[in-house]
A protein has these predicted regions:
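Glycine-rich adenosine-cofactor-binding loop
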Residues: 95, 136-159
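Rossmann-like adenosine-cofactor binding region
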Residues: 173-267
Length: 319
């Protein structure tokens, strides 16, 4: 009997040895890129541990025995979901694992803004000592979070001690712990102007693509803080630039963009009411080990039942 072949598109350091030791009957192969995998291995591999832009339609078609992709990231929008669905390939992601790190970034963005840390830093650089500078308090502020998944829920946990009012917007409008209220996407517009802070955590799907338009930003309170840690495609880039340059909102913290990486002459770099991070909020030293623990739990299920449950992506919804 040939043993099952598992290919990782990530080098996992010492984790590689422990995987090989924990599963002596399986064959593990580790590569840096999808293009490095030899054709004969593509023919035989059954499980792919991935995070690589090379996993496209052609790649999947070249792997006739592929049964499960364990994606070491949350967003799966760059994968050819239609082919994966057609072939009945199982897809899992790392949602929830990155939520701790991303939610801490969201909290730091809010505090950075409300406590005017940026102004203090600019003052320091210019040797200006301004003892009248006054930070804003978070208590009683109203927060609206687009999406109520694991990232939003973890963010709510961190924000709770600050005594804010937190509203969620989701497809179903179903109640989730920690939120004061949750409404459906249809109700979004009636809640936008009440929010002091708006946080997007939505994944990219057909429904969320360019979900926000200029109209939404016109409804928002002009003192509003907008944070995007979901996907950049929630709003068309040229509309985002227009909205910010016309000061329809006070400030934006953006970690994701419609076109990544940002081009050096992108207009967003010229605006003073934007704080940019380079899609780094999910970077985490612990991600490989946490994601591999999840992979091992799922692998045990796969070996026993030929199926996995935890963090399975609904291929019809795209998350």
């Amino acid at each position: 009997v040939k043993s099952m072949k598992i290919v990782s598109l990530k080098r996992l350091g010492e984790i590689e040895t422990s995987l090989i030791n924990n599963y002596p009957d399986l064959e593990f192969y580790f590569f840096k890129n999808a293009v490095d995998i030899p054709t004969e291995l593509k023919d035989e591999l059954e499980i792919l541990i991935g995070y690589d832009s090379g996993v496209d339609k052609n790649f999947i078609n070249a792997c006739p025995n592929l049964k499960w992709i364990s994606w070491y990231a949350t967003g799966v929008n760059n994968l050819p979901l239609d082919v994966i669905k057609e072939r009945n390939i199982i897809l899992t992601n790392t949602r929830g694992i990155q939520a701790k790190q991303v939610s801490e970034f969201v909290l730091s963005f809010i505090l950075d803004d409300y406590k005017k840390m940026r102004t203090s830093y600019v003052n320091q650089v210019n040797k200006v000592y301004d003892s009248k500078l006054t930070g804003k308090r978070l208590s009683d502020e109203k927060v609206l979070i687009l999406g109520t998944g694991s990232l939003a829920q973890q963010t709510v946990k961190l924000l709770k001690p600050f005594e804010l009012e937190i509203i969620g917007i989701s497809k179903s409008g179903h109640h989730k712990d920690g939120f004061d209220n949750i409404y459906t996407i249809e109700d979004l517009e009636s809640h936008l102007n009440k929010a002091d802070i708006i946080i997007n955590t939505l994944p990219e799907t057909q429904e969320t693509y360019h979900l926000l338009s200029e109209r939404h930003f016109k409804i928002m309170n002009d003192k509003c803080l907008f944070i995007n840690v979901g996907r950049g495609t929630i709003i068309e880039e040229k509309i985002l630039i227009k909205v910010l340059s016309h000061n329809l909102i006070r400030h934006a913290y953006l970690d994701v963009f419609e076109n990544e990486p940002l081009d050096a002459n992108n207009e967003l770099y010229k605006l003073d009411n934007v704080t940019i991070t380079a899609h780094i909020t999910g970077n985490d030293k612990n991600i490989k080990s946490d994601a591999t623990k999840l992979f091992e739990r799922n692998l045990d299920d796969f070996l026993n039942k030929n199926d996995v449950i935890e963090n399975r992506v609904d291929l019809y919804k795209g998350y």
